[in-house]
């Protein structure tokens, strides 16, 4: 048994068609003997009828009794044929809709899966970078802690040496350098102390006869030779005697007051310069 729809039909539609055909066959038999062959005639939908039903389905896939009767009247079909066609068309439409929805969902799922994989790779890369940075920070912190620990265990540097004290010692208001200078002045044969000692020495300690004979008086040489710079009151003997006022004694002060002439105050000293030219001349 074939259905009235192009492209096949459902079992429910075939059962509905059988019921319609049985009704038609029974009606034909009751009408007369010649009408018995009508029940065996098969009806098929024309192409125009199929296009009209498609337009009606696209407009509204719901089929109420009034609309079913109007479509059947316009297409010259039985109302039950119209109802079965709409039922089968809704089933195919639902199947195609499910297939379209499934394809869309599957494509969306694939896109989300790819995006999820990309996000997972990014997450793994970021986690590896974070771990690397954490290792670097831990290494730097460990190095700093080791340096701090080494600084703590290292003994402190020794204190700097104290500044060297000045070695000169002040004794009675004068330093060692001043004392050494005074000592050198006193040890010098030209110092005021030596001159004073020589001037005040007793005649018993000298060979007076030999000394006077050695320094024989020579009036000509004495008168011709003069040493103003050597025996002048402003000579360097005065400077030494002034420096040694505290240690040269009263004789040095007396010689300084005499303007340097105290060294050769006596006649024997004044004539003592004859040896410069007594024998050489």
Swiss-Prot record:
DNA-binding residue intervals: 38-97
A GO term from the CC aspect: nucleus
Region of interest: Disordered: 1-46, 149-182
InterPro entries: HD (IPR001356), HDZip_class_I_plant (IPR045224), Homeobox_CS (IPR017970), Homeodomain-like_sf (IPR009057), Leu_zip_homeo (IPR003106)
Alphabetized SMART domains for the sequence: HOX
Cystines in this chain: none
Chain intervals with Gly residues compositional bias: 1-10, 26-38
Localization: Nucleus
Protein name: Homeobox-leucine zipper protein HOX8
Chain's gene name: HOX8
């Amino acid at each position: 048994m074939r259905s009235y729809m192009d492209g096949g039909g459902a079992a429910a539609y075939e059962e509905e068609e059988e019921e319609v055909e049985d009704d038609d066959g029974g009606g034909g038999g009751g009408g007369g003997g010649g009408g018995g062959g009508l029940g065996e005639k098969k009806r098929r939908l024309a192409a125009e009828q199929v296009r009209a039903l498609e337009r009606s389905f696209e407009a509204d896939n719901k089929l109420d009794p009034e609309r079913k009767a109007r479509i059947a009247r316009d297409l010259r079909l039985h109302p039950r044929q119209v109802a079965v066609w709409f039922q089968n068309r809704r089933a195919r439409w639902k199947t195609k809709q499910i297939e379209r929805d499934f394809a869309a969902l599957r494509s969306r799922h694939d896109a989300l899966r790819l995006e999820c994989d990309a996000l997972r790779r990014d997450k793994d890369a970021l986690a590896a970078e974070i771990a690397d940075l954490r290792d670097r920070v831990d290494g730097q912190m460990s190095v700093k802690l080791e340096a701090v620990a080494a600084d703590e265990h290292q003994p402190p540097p020794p204190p700097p040496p104290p500044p060297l004290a000045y070695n000169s010692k002040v004794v009675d208001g004068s330093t060692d350098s001043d004392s050494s200078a005074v000592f050198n002045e006193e040890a010098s044969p030209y110092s005021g102390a030596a001159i004073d000692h020589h001037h005040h020495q007793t005649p018993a300690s000298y060979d007076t006869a030999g000394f006077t004979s050695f320094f024989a008086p020579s009036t000509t040489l004495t008168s011709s030779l003069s040493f103003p710079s050597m025996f002048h009151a402003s000579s360097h003997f005065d400077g030494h005697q002034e420096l040694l006022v505290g240690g040269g004694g009263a004789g040095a002060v007396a010689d300084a007051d005499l303007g340097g002439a105290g060294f050769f105050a006596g006649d024997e000293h004044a004539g003592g310069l004859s040896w410069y030219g007594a024998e050489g001349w």
